[in-house]
Amino acid sequence: MSDLHKAFAKSKLAKLPPEAPLLSESSSMNHPAESSHDEDSSSVSSTGTVIPSPSRQLFARASQGSSDSSSLSWSDFFAKELFLTRETDTLRIIHHVYLTPPTDSGPLFVMHHGAGSSGLSFATCAEEIRKILPKAGILSLDARDHGRTSVQRTDGGAAELDLSLETLNQDLVYVARKTQAEMGWEELPDLVLVGHSLGGAVITDVAKKGELGNKVLAYAVLDVVEGSAMDALQSMEKYLSTRPSRFPSLTSGVEWHTRSRTIRNRASARVSVPSLLYKEETPSDPAKPWVWRTNLSATKPFWEDWFIGLSRKFLEARGGKLLLLAGTDRLDKELMIGQMQGKYQLQVLPEAGHFIQEDMPAKTAQILVDFYKRNDRSALVLPPKVADMRASAAMQKGAGAGASFSALHGGSSAGHLHKP
């Protein structure tokens, strides 16, 4: 699993002396006038006329203090949250979704996070997308057994953990269709599927199976490929044993993520990390009552299922394809060949860590918006078909011949027969 493999490497950095400075994108994003880096100027200029939201003021305080790890609210980044109830013969599932609806026929970016994360992993990126493309909508879900999505048996017992790729596929399709019904949309907007790590495997599977029909314009996979993900399975359990299992507070959880360089953008960590933890009612260690919502060790039976065949499906599915990586070393052979054949768009942000959308939200947003625009069918002006051009030319030629014939015969279009 790519995210855990990356995090394992980062866990070694956590043991080093004081942390290096966090990525500067958040400060340049929040204080454009103070930025002197040309590499950020394009994203800053694209948002220069947007009125700052309340979250921008909160970010400003964090930048000035440089160590503020207090939590930020989801409502600073999304318009609403939905709780979508789904019942089967044995289960009652309440899917939790963060949503900002599209306007003026704008696209809907459907985001799926990685294992152990939540829908708020895309919070800062979602806000940046809206700055660049105000008509765009964002739907970012909590996968089952993640965030605030819950699964219970109808008889009140504990539900068996099911994070198979097929189940996650069906969950995403259900959330998209149910959101359409809840919002009263006659049809789904044009969709751009975006998945990080495990989420990349899920959205690729949905695109390959055509579950959402031709509404899927394109799909983007963030920092996961089959080869490196499968290789990382060997070190996954070791990584899980090295990270803290408990925290004294939410603030300390945010601090651990930034100091370990798991998330390199403090502003994003402040909104995403609190959703990863919950406070035990009767903690085994009262000094550290905050624990992980998702037991990643328990997901081991599904690890290989998530990523086997990912590269093939990514290349074969219909729609525009984007692979956004933190390093080209992640490409496997199948994807390298596909890239040389021009089958998909490849973007690399080497300055980011595994959580690209959190580390570099403005740059990730710009890449995603540009990707959408390249695949926007409504913006295409197709040339006329050759057959239509020939038919039009023939009609014009025929009209010209008719006019000449009429002139030669006294202007009478009906014609008259004269006896000799």
From Swiss-Prot:
EC no.? 3.1.1.89
**InterPro entries, per the entry:** AB_hydrolase_1 (IPR000073), AB_hydrolase_fold (IPR029058), PPase_methylesterase_euk (IPR016812)
The reaction(s) annotated as catalysed by this protein in its Swiss-Prot or TrEMBL entry are: [phosphatase 2A protein]-C-terminal L-leucine methyl ester + H2O = [phosphatase 2A protein]-C-terminal L-leucine + methanol + H(+)
Which residues pair up as cystines? Answer: none
The UniProt transmembrane annotation reads: none
Q: Where is this region: Disordered?
A: 18-51
Give the UniProt keywords, A-Z. Answer: Hydrolase, Serine esterase
| Active-site residues per Swiss-Prot or TrEMBL entry | 197, 223, 354
Compositional bias segments (type: Low complexity): 18-28, 42-51
Q: What GO molecular function annotation could you give as one example from this UniProt entry?
A: protein C-terminal methylesterase activity
Family in the record: Belongs to the AB hydrolase superfamily.
Q: What does this protein do?
A: Demethylates proteins that have been reversibly carboxymethylated. Demethylates the phosphatase PP2A catalytic subunit.
Supply the name of the protein.
Protein phosphatase methylesterase 1
Organism of this sequence: Aspergillus fumigatus (strain ATCC MYA-4609 / CBS 101355 / FGSC A1100 / Af293)
Lineage of this protein's species?
Eukaryota, Fungi, Dikarya, Ascomycota, Pezizomycotina
